[in-house]
Amino acid sequence: KSNNLAQYELQVEELVDKELEVFKAMYLQETKIKYLIIIGDYISEISRKVEKNKEDNTIETAKFLKYIRKLDEKTLEEISEELNLSNESDALVIPYMMIFKCMAESIGAESLWAPGTNVSDGIAFHYAQKNNMIRVEHDFEADVLSAARNLSERYMSYTPHIDALTQMATLIFDTMKKVHGLGRRERLLLQVAAILHDCGKYISFANGPSCSYDIIMASEIIGLTHKEREIIANTVLYNTWPLPDYEDLADKLDHDSYLTVAKLSAILRVSNAMDRSHKQKFKNVKAAVKGRELVITIETMDDIALEKALFDAKTAYFENVFSIKPVIKEKRVYG
């Protein structure tokens, strides 16, 4: 192996190691990883060489690293021959190997799994699912909500309030289905917005809404597009701030997305006001649209003067968006 190639490999390792250290500090901390899933070019070829008789594509990390170090002593042409690659001078082989090696060493997983898929498979699957060409049993919405909850926990959001708010927002959304005309996907976006609405307070109490917006836009939430993250981030922002005219947001949102933000933020505002004290005072909450009113029936043993006052203050925006006035119908419960 030439000195230039050895120096190149060292530079790649240093660069990748630095990024992995930041990733571990932010996302893993003391978490023990059992399996590291690797997709992409060359990993399937390496997997077949390391574990020749296995059918589940799993590799013991120690065996994997031993084989990578063996390849590391070879030239590019020798590596290509070892892995039976069609292109003997593929310049990406070495960087891929270095990335695989750094990840396996840094993450410290017990085993690696190479499912044999790549990004192209994901694009094809997404197209087929979107156009109802295949039936999917896996609940991808649960993955989105799980990723959102992990992000919420990282920024120390108060879980009991998050759960209560998510349930309330979902109840109002479902009750208003014929009024707002939104679908299942927008329901998911509302739930994610409810989960993440307070994450910015970890950075600043005074500028919580704008910090929440920045956190959401800077975070890759599995299963969401950039446009959907923009809708969620603006829903969270205008849960607190007044919603500007469309012309002021036209550089961020198209007209349909703007209307979605208006509807979701109106629902989130009213839902948030129902648990403003963060004490989950309401039990057996029910909602129904009656004429021009959204009647929310609650049972409580507590004083809800604060919630009622803030609720009344939030209803004007909701009524402006939907032409329906939310009202609380209280049932006293004595224990």
Specify the residue positions occupied by each region the protein language model found.
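Low-complexity, glycine/alanine/valine/leucine- and proline-rich hydrophobic stretches
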Residues: 277-326
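Helical "lid/coupling" subdomains associated with nucleotide-phosphate turnover
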Residues: 1-269, 275, 290-292, 296
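Amphipathic alpha-helical domain-onset/packing element
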Residues: 270-271, 314
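A short amphipathic beta-strand at an alpha->beta junction
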Residues: 110, 322-335
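Short, glycine-/Ser/Thr-/acidic-enriched flexible segments
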Residues: 43, 119-120, 301-303, 333
